[in-house]
Regions:
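Structured, solvent-exposed acidic/aromatic patches
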Residues: 1-284, 288, 324-326
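C-terminal functional modules
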Residues: 257, 264-268, 282-411
């Protein structure tokens, strides 16, 4: 059963911590350890943090089954866990070829993943509203905005050390029908979305159908609103094959802090404060993107490096906690932002577990002809090579191996 699998994983991690904590244990040779260069203390922190993540995933399911995981969670919260960016469990890319490079790089292949994937309007609006410094690191401004300027105008804009050529297209040359599009609001309702002239930051409106494909980046025509270059895209940093900020992430310290904040808010642990864990999670997320804590400039336009005041950001409306139940929504939102382009699987799992950020579920539900996916289906060879266990597992899921089947931790 899935309960037994979770218990087995808990046991594996406990045993790993026991072995690594033994002073007579030599651990891995530093030149054989690609994660922590033979540092046993970091492996212990990673194991404890992984266990804490798994316990957060399954807390409610175990509680319903008669087992309270709170004492085990408290033991970790009072002990050793990932708490600094140097504790992050992630791998660097060599950048020597396509297979050993960051997944959105443009040096090899078509570069379509980089050019055609776009942030949603909700995400960009949210980041603009709180002037989130991560936006200036991960994304670039609209390269060909529809403009109120009377003639086509070029402007070079430097952000975070990268220079972008922005070409303003006069609105006089645009079909008026292309200045509005039907989209969906955060409740899934169909609304009219106007294009904001001269926008530097304009995310992709949520479409009416999941099949809608946005135009390519070569401005070949069609609905100008939906042209790729009319919308915010990934920054030049994200196109690189390798960089200290572009890593294969297993788990980061910022996630652990948000897990601790959630656990403290829910009463699963009694150590620390929700506020301290939450704000430390934000600061660690900023730090991993090399956002400098300092005096924030009036604008990040023209910057060689993004600088922001960490404490001032945490005090902003929409970010600061207020001690109410809404704090769980803010924790989930900041955790979701910290997962941007680095840990999509955990972001997906977290939403399935908590239902937060809530707007995702509302928009997904508005596509009523589709069943929301909760899980990956089993590999095809399981049904033939492991038929007995496969059949038993599918039976526990309700008889069908479907993405929409809820797992034990979600029931």
């Amino acid at each position: 059963s899935q309960k037994e699998i979770y218990e087995y994983m808990f046991g594996l991690l406990d045993n790993a911590v026991k072995i690594l904590s033994d002073p007579n244990s030599q651990g891995l040779p530093s030149n054989h350890d690609v994660l922590f260069a033979g540092d046993k203390t970091k492996w212990v922190k990673f194991a404890n943090s992984l266990k804490f993540r798994l316990m957060a995933h399954s807390y409610n399911a175990f509680k319903a089954a008669g087992k309270d995981l709170a004492p085990e969670m408290q033991k970790i919260a009072s002990g050793s866990y990932m708490s600094a960016t140097t504790d992050n469990a992630s791998l660097a890319f060599s950048g020597l070829n396509e297979g050993e490079s960051w997944y959105l790089q443009t040096k090899w292949g078509t570069g379509n993943d980089y050019s055609e994937q776009k942030p949603t309007k909700y995400l960009i609006d949210q980041m603009v509203a709180i002037d989130d410094p991560r936006m200036y690191v991960i994304f670039k401004p609209v390269l060909t905005p529809i403009s109120s300027k009377p003639v086509k105008t070029n402007e070079d804009i430097k952000i975070n050390g990268f220079t972008y050529r922005v070409t303003y297209d006069p609105v006089s040359g645009i079909n008026p029908n292309d200045l509005n599009v039907a989209g969906r609001d955060l409740n899934g309702n169909i609304i009219n979305v106007p294009y904001i002239l001269d926008s530097k930051w304009f995310g992709t409106p949520t479409p009416l159908t999941v099949q809608l494909i946005y135009a390519g980046s070569n401005l070949t025509g069609g609905n100008s609103f939906y042209d790729n270059r009319r919308l915010t895209g990934f920054s030049a940093l994200i196109a690189k094959p390798t960089d200290a900020r572009l890593r294969a992430v297993m788990m980061e310290s910022s996630e652990m802090m948000f897990l601790l904040a959630e656990a403290r808010k829910n009463g699963w642990i009694s150590t620390g404060t929700v506020k301290d864990y939450y704000e430390q999670g934000i600061k660690l997320s900023f730090s991993r993107w090399q956002i400098v804590d300092g005096t924030k400039p009036a604008s990040h336009i023209g910057s060689d490096q993004i600088i922001d005041n960490y404490n001032a950001y945490c005090a902003k409306d929409g970010v600061a906690l207020d001690g109410t139940a809404a704090d769980l929504d803010k924790i989930a939102l900041q955790k979701w932002l910290s997962f941007l382009i680095t840990n999509q699987t955990e972001a997906f799992t977290d939403f399935n577990r908590t239902g937060k950020p809530a707007f995702i579920g509302k928009i997904a539900a508005s596509f009523s002809s589709y069943s929301y996916p909760y899980r990956y289906t089993y590999p095809l060879d399981e049904s033939s090579n492991n038929k007995e266990n496969y059949t038993s597992a599918v039976t526990a899921l309700g008889g069908k191996d479907l993405p929409s089947a809820k797992m034990w931790i979600q029931k």
